[in-house]
């Protein structure tokens, strides 16, 4: 990864902040009301940036589910409410803005301290569950600093209200604060996290907080340097080190991506270390896991063109192409870093003329495509065991069906370790509205490969086709095992059906996770 953008950003931050601090010290910037408004904007931006960075920080430990997001947002809102109340109380007891900037500096100091212990805290909490773990982590890592930053808005309103009408003052402060929040969201989402990673983002926010606090305290150039230089030093803190099992890791706009290895095994992890995407021996085609079952597709239907929604490490595509090298394959993957990893560390043949990888979100890509396919593979998860809800609804399956040739087959992996198989049943009930024939190949690890046909077919037909696999090929053992395990998938009456309007995938998955503990 090129370091040029980072150096440019750091240079911009250093020059801009130093110029502002110098201006204060030399008298070039004399408007205290303007300083207070800029402070409101910057602290608003830092709060939103911290909130976005928190989700990425938590992903490897608690996942990316809506429960993690909901819990985190609730705790942050509580911290902001506390900060607003504290800010109003302090403002009524202060004659100047000095105390405000002392509080902001204290927030930066706390952020600096947390940088050294945050990973240890998260490792300690990662098995505590989404709600409890996220709540405790947020209370320790983010609540103190966000409470301190939230002091700004009511304090600035009080400072400005001494010279202006209160209504105009409040409107002006919240306008500046909101503008800063918008800028913080955009800069963090589109630049800081994707290009620099969560760790460097948190370091930049820590330095920025210290500099904002210093800007309201300095009176001389020497004093400015005393506070300014340690703040910039935060940017030079060493990078995180990982265990020897981590072969490669990076952060993208969508995931924390890691390639793990042990002996001759290699596997891909996205966001949550407890759930791997593909595990395979180095240089091998077959994994011994559920992804091998996808290679049965060309033996079940005549296939010339295949669509793979979700790439992962490319295990399913690699094994399918080994069985049917003539297939024209379109693979859709939202994360370019995942596609890069699949080629570099797992041998996905991106250079082959019959394999096209499209970097896009699966459902919008499908809706915009005019192609039809004989075989569609669906294996998409985010934040560990959670299927994106909009990829398991009736409307999605109708869209997929409209891109399927009459003699085609849809194969989908559903991860469900619960005894009730609630998620599998709900997925089946939804599929049944579109595909008349459903079958499943279940494995003991909780992965279930669902076979959905757009026509009537019997389980005997499935077994007969599997029995035709050449006994001298590597696929023979997989086909024989599948023939023993395959069964018709019949959802119980009254089972939940997923729609775009209501798809409680996260709720069902959460129950599944709790029942498996």
Residue ranges of predicted features:
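A motif-centric feature for acidic-aromatic and gly/ser/thr-rich catalytic loops and repeats
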Residues: 347
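Conserved alpha-helix/loop element of class I SAM-dependent methyltransferases that forms part
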Residues: 288-302
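Alpha-helical transmembrane segments of multi-pass membrane proteins
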Residues: 2-251, 261-267, 272-277, 299-307, ...
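Class I SAM-dependent methyltransferase Rossmann-like catalytic core
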Residues: 278-287
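Short, surface-exposed charged micro-motifs
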Residues: 256-258
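Phosphate/oxyanion-binding active-site loops and adjacent basic polyanion-contact surfaces
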Residues: 149-152, 286-290
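SAM/dcSAM-binding transferase cores
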Residues: 456-517
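Short, polar/flexible loop-turn hinges at active-site or ligand-entry regions and domain interfaces
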Residues: 350-352
């Amino acid at each position: 990864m090129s370091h040029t953008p980072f150096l440019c950003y750091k240079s911009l931050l250093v020059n801009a902040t130093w110029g502002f601090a110098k201006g204060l010290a030399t008298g070039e910037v004399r408007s205290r009301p303007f300083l207070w408004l800029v402070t409101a904007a910057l602290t608003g931006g830092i709060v939103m940036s911290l909130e976005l960075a928190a989700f990425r920080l938590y992903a490897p430990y608690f996942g990316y589910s809506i429960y993690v997001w909901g819990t985190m947002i609730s705790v942050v809102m509580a911290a902001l409410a506390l900060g607003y109340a504290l800010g109003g109380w302090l403002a009524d007891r202060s004659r100047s803005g000095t105390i405000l900037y002392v509080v902001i500096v204290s927030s930066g100091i706390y952020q600096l301290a947390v940088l050294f212990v945050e990973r240890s805290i998260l490792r300690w909490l990662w098995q505590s569950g989404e709600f409890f773990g996220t709540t405790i982590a947020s209370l320790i890592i983010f609540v103190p600093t966000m409470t301190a930053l939230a002091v700004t808005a009511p304090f600035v309103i009080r400072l400005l209200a001494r010279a202006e009408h209160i209504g105009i003052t409040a409107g002006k402060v919240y306008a500046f604060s909101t503008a800063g929040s918008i800028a913080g969201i955009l800069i963090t989402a589109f630049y800081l996290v994707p290009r620099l990673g969560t760790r460097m983002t948190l370091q930049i926010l820590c330095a920025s907080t210290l500099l904002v606090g210093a800007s309201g305290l300095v009176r001389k150039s020497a004093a400015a340097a005393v506070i300014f230089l340690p703040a910039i030093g935060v940017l030079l803190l060493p990078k995180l080190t990982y265990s020897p099992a981590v072969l490669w890791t990076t952060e993208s706009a969508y995931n924390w991506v890691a390639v793990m290895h042990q002996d001759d095994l290699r596997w891909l992890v996205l966001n949550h270390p407890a759930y791997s995407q593909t595990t395979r021996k180095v240089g091998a085609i077959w994994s011994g896991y559920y992804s091998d079952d996808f290679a049965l597709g060309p033996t079940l239907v005549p296939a010339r063109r295949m669509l793979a929604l979700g790439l992962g490490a490319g295990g399913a595509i690699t094994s399918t192409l080994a069985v049917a090298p003539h297939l024209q394959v379109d693979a859709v993957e939202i994360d370019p870093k995942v596609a890069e990893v699949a080629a570099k560390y797992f041998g996905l043949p991106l250079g082959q003329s019959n394999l096209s990888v499209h970097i896009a979100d699966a459902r919008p890509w499908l809706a915009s495509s005019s192609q039809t396919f004989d075989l569609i593979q669906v294996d998409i998860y985010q934040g560990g065991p959670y299927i994106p809800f909009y990829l398991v609804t009736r409307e999605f399956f109708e869209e997929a069906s409209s891109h399927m040739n009459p003699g085609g087959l849809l194969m989908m992996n559903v991860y469900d370790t619960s005894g009730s198989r609630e998620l599998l049943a709900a997925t089946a009930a939804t599929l049944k509205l579109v595909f008349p024939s459903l079958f499943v190949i279940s494995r003991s690890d909780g992965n279930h490969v669902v076979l959905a046909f757009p026509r009537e077919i019997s389980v005997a037909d499935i077994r007969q086709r599997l029995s035709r696999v050449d006994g001298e090929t590597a696929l023979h053992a997989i086909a024989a095992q599948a023939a023993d395990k395959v069964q018709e998938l019949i959802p119980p009456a009254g089972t939940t059906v997923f729609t775009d309007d209501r798809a409680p995938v996260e709720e069902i998955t959460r129950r599944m996770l709790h029942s498996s503990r």
